[in-house]
Curated annotation (Swiss-Prot):
Lineage: Eukaryota, Fungi, Dikarya, Ascomycota, Saccharomycotina
Assembly behavior: Forms a complex with TRM82.
Annotated protein name in UniProt: tRNA (guanine-N(7)-)-methyltransferase
Organism: Yarrowia lipolytica (strain CLIB 122 / E 150)
The EC number(s) this enzyme carries: 2.1.1.33
CDD domains (UniProt xref): AdoMet_MTases
Region annotation Disordered: where it falls in the sequence: 1-54
Transmembrane intervals: none
Ranges of compositional bias, category Basic and acidic residues: 19-42
Listed GO MF terms: tRNA (guanine(46)-N7)-methyltransferase activity; tRNA binding
Binding, S-adenosyl-L-methionine: G110, E133, I134, N168, A169, C188, T266, E267, E268
Family affiliation: Belongs to the class I-like SAM-binding methyltransferase superfamily. TrmB family.
Main location: nucleus
Keywords: Methyltransferase, Nucleus, RNA-binding, S-adenosyl-L-methionine, Transferase, tRNA processing, tRNA-binding
Length: 292
């Protein structure tokens, strides 16, 4: 039996209640929309102009044209591009206005549709913020969202400090970031992987905690939030057990403006709030390196 392409299954789910003509019309519109957005995205990356609407305004992307499943298998071969080392990464492609020598300091792992990135941009105006997302269409949506926001705020150079790339942080994080490069790293509503045999695919594990300790500088913060209590306890257990992390006190968390932003600005967080669900937060500080 042939394995169907993910996009085919997404289309079936989206058009399940549509008639034949309505379904064909929707598929055609989505293909045309995605093609137009891809052309704009490539043009923006190359720094060349592209045809704009008559009113000169680049509109924010429409989420319905970027449908994709909620999660992706991090162990699958996703044919990702990644640098051999951080020194090989061309950050100017993602941040055209960055200052010479300026490096990414904040990472949102599994950034979803970019709500936290957009909220953090004006909050941390002097820091480069990167979202990493493994799903193709979700990454494309965030790229298009940033292109539109930059265009809409070009007079003030708004949103020049955020960007997104498609990548697998569980495999290639040290390929992008140097030792101690990050001051903040966010894990917002990650895949809970409920089944015990899937726990190895969780974004916080004993092995991965060591990688996070490598890329986060002493004094830097690891932010976690989830609506799944079991996952919250799992992340707390593994981070607390690592010798290079210590948990922030409740008072320290309450005083951190990034925690307040994380609680309300992600798309998943807003969904949890609408459903009156719980949100579990835990933040950990990177300890100083031991003296050998």
């Amino acid at each position: 039996m042939l394995k169907r392409d993910q996009s085919e299954m997404d289309i079936e789910a989206e058009t399940a209640n549509m008639g034949k003509e309505e379904k064909e019309s929707f598929v055609h519109k989505r293909q045309k929309y995605r093609q137009e957005q891809e052309e704009k995205r490539l043009a923006a990356k190359k720094g060349v102009s592209f045809e704009q609407p008559e009113d000169g305004e680049i509109k924010l992307p429409k989420k319905r044209y970027y449908r994709q499943r909620a999660h992706s298998n991090p162990f699958s071969d996703h044919q990702l591009e990644y640098p051999e080392s951080p020194a090989d990464m061309d950050w100017d492609v993602l941040y055209p206005n960055r200052k010479e020598g300026q490096k990414v300091e904040v990472a949102d792992i599994g950034c979803g549709f970019g709500g936290l990135l957009v909220a953090l941009s004006p909050q941390l105006p002097n820091q480069l913020i990167l979202g990493m997302e493994i799903r193709v269409q979700v990454t494309n949506y965030v790229e298009d969202r940033i292109v539109a926001l930059r265009h809409q705020n070009k007079e003030t150079d708004g949103y020049q400090n955020i960007s997104v790339l498609r990548g697998n942080a569980m495999k290639f994080l040290p390929n992008f970031f140097e030792k101690g490069q990050l001051s903040k790293i966010f894990f917002c509503f990650p895949d809970p992987h409920f089944k015990q045999r899937k726990h190895k695919a969780r974004i916080v594990t004993t092995t991965l905690c060591s990688e996070y300790a490598y890329v986060v500088r002493p004094g830097g913060i690891v932010y976690t939030i989830t609506d799944v209590k079991d996952l919250h306890e799992w992340m707390v257990k593994h981070l607390a057990a690592h010798p290079l992390f210590e948990r922030l006190t409740k008072e320290e968390e309450d005083a951190d403006p990034c925690v307040a932003t994380m609680l309300v600005e992600t798309e998943e967080g807003k969904k949890v709030a609408r459903n009156e669900g719980d949100k579990f937060v835990a933040c950990f500080r990177r300890k100083e390196n031991p003296e050998w």
